[in-house]
Amino acid sequence: MKHLWKYIAGALAFALPVASCSDDNTSDFPDKEWGELTAPVLTVSEEEITLDANKADREALKFSWTAASVVTRSSSVEYDLYLNIEGEDLFKGIKREWGGEADLTISFTHEELNDLIITTFGGKSGERFAFRACVYAHTDNYLIEDKTSEEVAFAATAYAAEVVKPASLWM
C-alpha cells in the first residue's frame, strides 16, 4: 500500500505538467492592422502675422487639416490641436479640441492669439514668438492606433502697447 501511493503521486506529478503544457488554442486580441487611421495633413493660413488691436475680433490665423480616414467599422475620429512655442515640448502647450464642425478647422482671432501670447506664454507687447502646431487624430476604439500630423511653424507678434498721455498734468 505504501508503494501504491508513491506510484499514484509519481503519475500525478508527471501528468499535471504534461497537461498544463499542452497547446492552448485561445484566440488573441485582433491585430491592429484591421483598423488603420491615416495621419491628417495640417496647414496654417499665415506663416508670419503681426497682431493688430484694431482688428481684435477678426480672424488672425486659421488651422485646417485633411480628414484622417479610418478603414474599419464605424468609428468616429476626434481631433486635438496642440500649440506651443518653438523649442518646447509641443504636447505640453495649448490643447484645443475640435468642436466637430463639418469643416476641419480651428481659428484664432487677433485678440485670442494676443491673449495667448501675453497670458499663457508670458510675452510682452511687441514681442515676436515662433510657434509650432500639430493635429492629433484619435478614435474611441483602442484597436486603432492614433496618428499625429506633421508639425507646422508660424510666428506671431503681439500688440504694441499704446501709450496714452494725459492732456495736462495736475499737481
Enumerate the language-model features and the residues they cover.
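Bacterial N-terminal signal peptides that target proteins for export
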Residues: M1-I8
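Alpha-helical transmembrane segments
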Residues: A11-A15
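C-terminal motif of bacterial Sec signal peptides marking the signal peptidase cleavage site
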Residues: L16-S20
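Insoluble glucan recognition modules
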Residues: S22-Y82, W98-M171
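Beta-propeller fold detector
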Residues: K92-E97
